[in-house]
Amino acid sequence: MATRPPLMPPANETESSVSRISREGKKITYKLSVMQQPERARACGAGAKSSADRRPVDPPPVVELRIFESDPNDDLHKTDITFAYNANFFLFATLETARPMAQGRLTGPPTCPVLTGVPVAGVAYLDRPQQAGYFIFPDLSVRHEGRYRLSFHLYEEIKDIKDADKDTPMPDLNSSTNLTKPSAPKAHLNFRLEVKSVPFTVYSAKKFPGLATSTSLSRIIAEQGCRVRIRRDVRMRRRGEKRTDDYDFDDERAFATRSDRYTTPDMYAANSAERARSTSISTTADTSFPYGSDAQRRPSAGDYGFQGAQPYQRSMPAASAAPAPAPVHSPATSAQTSSYQSHLSFGATQSQYPAPQLPPTPQSATPTNTYSPHPSYSHSRNPSNGTEYDATSSGYPYPQPRLPADRPSYSKAALPPLRLEPPKAPNMQTSTDSRSSDANAYPTLSQPPVPRAPTPANHVTSLPPLKVLSGEYSHPSQPNAQSPHHDLGSGKRLLWETNHTLSKRSHEETFGSDERPLHNGMRPDMDQYPSMGRKQPDYGRLPFYTDSRDEMAYKRANGRMVMKILPALP
């Protein structure tokens, strides 16, 4: 089967010129050149919304017009009179198929025009890229997909009689015009020449590859005031269709370079143990903690500048120590306390708290050594059921031998308010007698430091001397229904219980829901708090007030109800 030879391009493709003789005997030559060829377009379709659905041909076609004047017998010496020639020009664009097709017998003309938009353009005299007249078509759309080419027709309106054609009759300028009777228009248009563009493809909406960036010619024309839409980025196809080889514009690289701008920044999601607290001086974090180090930090008295509140400072295994007072202790002390870390260390590296070997002058007056009375309040504000603050949920790592899970008493949550005092033998004896029936639970200061072992007796050696709180912990008491400190409605016990020594107290029973120091201007060394090492909760101060004062109940942010005694009126 013989192959069909390729179609020859028309003679007036891309460039076309024509000459004529004027009345003065001058030879005028018109030259049209398609400076910017159309390459692609998206079919806008037909229907009610097609007028609003404009899909312009990309890039917009630009046709250049230049006019030359010469002697009829000398074509070598031509003068460019494009700017000096006095006439009106406009260019009319039509659409035709790239491959002519024979009309069938039963097929009629198309019901609707295939080319839409603005097919007419006036001349614009520009200085760049060169001095000439330019026709710009920024709003041309094609309704159906296929292979087409544009045909541009130049029309001229003559203003000077001397520039008219040689064979045309002379118009009668002196004839009077009758305004009452309509007459034919005096001005008329002359067709000069036609130029065609190269074939371009109109794609369907699914196959349309997209729009490329505006060309340099479009930018130059737009800079001189012409109406041309400028695209500064590639708007290529966003779908994943397979690209054809006849289209060179590929947006895979363009979208690959800027895909990170629109991607959710979740490439690195650090856990709570990896996120160091901003106020911490350490750069490492112990990942063995069940809770993140930044979730345990709460504002303490030292953070607010209250350094003189020494009764709030106590020694606990869960408290962190600053590295400053560490060198004053002996190496044996460091070796004794080097194996225990606190969940409140805020990511500090190997912080120890030498409790039994306190110097004569308390070293915990600095803000870094001040014990914050908010140990685990940040992650537990709900009522405790007795098993919430065990060896694992209180912030301690479970495998550590320092805090056995089967310990019968004296857990972190079961400790009453403590007070840090200089080492005194009588106070230590009184504390051991009042706190527990086991005399070996708390060693004296004369006991030499021994290596720590995972036993309950050795675990208590890290506790400082204790001081009995006067008035509240002198004897165990069970709140009853007749007691004014027992809430019948909610069943909450307003005072701490100390009689259940063999069972672990809950966090609420030990600390209370509102036990926070330095609130409402209260101080621990005031007269209404004698010999108190730590501020009681508000309902724990009920015995110090008279029964005639009213109670105030309000709801906290976590939804719990809190009762307070109204202040005395002057």
UniProtKB/Swiss-Prot annotation:
Gene3D superfamilies xref list: Velvet domain (2.60.40.3960)
Start-end of Basic and acidic residues biased regions: 505-526
Subcellular location: Nucleus; Cytoplasm
Phenotype upon loss of function: Reduces sporulation capacities on nitrate-containing medium. Results in the abundant formation of conidiophores. Leads to a reduction of gliotoxin production. Decreases the production of fumagillin, fumitremorgin G, fumigaclavine C and Glionitrin A. Also reduces protease activity.
Gene Ontology cellular component terms for the protein in this record: cytoplasm; nucleus
Polar residues bias locations: 278-287, 336-354, 363-395, 427-445
Region spans: PEST: 454-493
Biological processes per GO annotation: asexual sporulation resulting in formation of a cellular spore; conidiophore development; negative regulation of conidiophore development; negative regulation of sexual sporulation resulting in formation of a cellular spore; positive regulation of asexual sporulation resulting in formation of a cellular spore; positive regulation of gliotoxin biosynthetic process; spore germination; sporulation resulting in formation of a cellular spore
Low complexity bias: start-end ranges: 315-335
Domain Velvet: 25-231
Cited function: Component of the velvet transcription factor complex that controls sexual/asexual developmental ratio in response to light, promoting sexual development in the darkness while stimulating asexual sporulation under illumination. The velvet complex hat acts as a global regulator for secondary metabolite gene expression. Controls the expression of hundreds of genes, including those comprising more than a dozen known secondary metabolite gene clusters. Controls the expression of the gliotoxin gene cluster.
Subunit architecture: Component of the heterotrimeric velvet complex composed of laeA, veA and velB; VeA acting as a bridging protein between laeA and velB.
Record comment regarding domains: The C-terminal PEST domain is a region rich in proline, glutamic acid, serine and threonine residues that is required for the light-dependent regulation of development and secondary metabolism.
Family of the protein in this entry: Belongs to the velvet family. VeA subfamily.
Protein name from the UniProt record: Developmental and secondary metabolism regulator veA
Species the sequence originates in: Aspergillus fumigatus (strain ATCC MYA-4609 / CBS 101355 / FGSC A1100 / Af293) (Neosartorya fumigata)
